[in-house]
Amino acid sequence: MHDKKFLVGLIGADIQMSKSPTLHETEARHQGLDYRYELLDFAERGLPASALPDLLDEEERRGFSGSNITHPCKQTVIAHLNRLSEDAEMLGAVNTVVFRDGERIGHNTDWYGFYENFQRGLPDVAKSHAILLGAGGAGVALAHAAIKLGIERLSIFDQDSKRAETLAGQLNDRFSRDCARATTDVGSTLRSADGLIHATPTGMKSHPGLPIDPEWLLPRHWVADIVYMPLVTELLSLAERKGCRTLRGGGMTVYQAAAAFELFTGIAPDAERMSRHFMDLCRLSA
């Protein structure tokens, strides 16, 4: 048993169903750590997302080692940090904050989580062209991972077209080639695409529904979702009925959590053990 006690958290909205506390705490027990993971939920506390600085102050005051950050704060949190890791600065989004030596340090483990999940779940799919839905805090990480995975051309759609255009420009500059563009027509873009990457809250229990017209999806498409509550979203259910290859969001959750766990503790977790435990949790809550 290690002497140090770890108190970590998750800040976000509508997060009461999150599996992160059990996922982290179970791995910590295997590692012999005294480790507690708390949820700081805007909705549960009746607070607006603008209360983010107060929740960060609370965590720091109570001696938290760090905190995960989720929707809707992955970009707004940056203004309240002292510095960013290279990945977080490059992506302009943070999903993990470490409190160390009086500083708040922002990291991004989302892109790594998606990258690892895709490599394992869809290793041999066509990657000439894919469409990304969502250019927010999660979308910027997934876009980066998509190009690193070898997707040659990425079309990006967001309800805020300027945000999609900005992300496409950032990717083209970062990778020094014309690898991304914004689109305002998902249906026609999907006709020429190999796959769809979904990075919006649509499909969560608090945001039910489909992000696309069902007719746009064809059996030849692959579909990757980041939503993991429920594990099989309406989008993935539709894709499976149509015969598409699919990638569930749970794997991304596990691999980003494993990376965050190491940032909080300095101890490398067993990611495969965490994955098995995550699937057990999903079966219990199904």
Where are these regions (language model features)?
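Phosphate/diphosphate ligand-binding glycine-rich loop within oxidoreductases
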Residues: 2-123
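Hydrophobic Val/Ile/Leu positions in short beta-strands of Rossmann-like dinucleotide-binding domains
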Residues: 10, 132-133, 156, 225
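Glycine-rich Rossmann-fold phosphate-binding loop(s) that bind the pyrophosphate
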Residues: 13, 135-136
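N-terminal Rossmann-fold NAD(P) dinucleotide-binding loop
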Residues: 139-140, 232
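Conserved S-adenosyl-L-methionine
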Residues: 148-153, 242-245
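Rossmann-like adenosine-cofactor binding region
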Residues: 176-248
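Adenosine-phosphate binding glycine-rich loop
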Residues: 226-286
